[in-house]
Design a protein with these regions (language model features):
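Solvent-exposed soluble domains appended to multi-pass membrane proteins
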Residues: 1-130
Length: 130
């Protein structure tokens, strides 16, 4: 969108609206500005309906203030890791990590790289198990 580089997190922002009776009255008309992935929707919606979320191990209830905010994305060129404090993009071609938001911090970059790699490895291993 808007000629943005699809490797950058700004190209991944999507505005969503929740409508209907499942949403708690206390949340109606509210803006929820939390970082999440589309796979977080099942846990969020099922929690609103007081239904179990255990079958959706990759999902988190973003309406729960204790839920850790992060988003992951990948394409043929990169792996992106988005947190409230920093956004990182790992380039497959160059093998480098680019910090796109936040204070430059090599320790933070390495921690984010480890988290993103662990997430991707676990995701891939789960996929292979199907």
């Amino acid at each position: 969108p808007l000629n943005r580089d699809m490797s950058h997190p700004e190209s991944r922002k999507i505005t969503s609206m929740l409508l209907g009776g499942a949403l708690a009255d206390s949340l109606r008309g509210k803006t929820i500005d939390r970082i999440c992935n589309q796979n977080d929707w099942p846990a969020m919606l099922l929690s609103q309906l007081n239904l179990p979320t255990t079958k959706f191990s990759w999902s988190k209830n973003i309406l729960d203030p204790a839920a850790v905010e992060f988003a992951y994305y990948s394409n043929e060129n990169c792996l992106g890791w988005i947190t409230p404090h920093k956004n990182y993009v790992y380039s497959y071609a160059s093998g480098t990590i680019e910090e796109l938001k936040g204070i430059q911090d090599s320790t933070g970059s390495q921690t984010a790289a480890i988290q993103a790699k662990a997430y991707l490895q676990t995701l891939y291993q789960t996929y292979l198990g199907y």
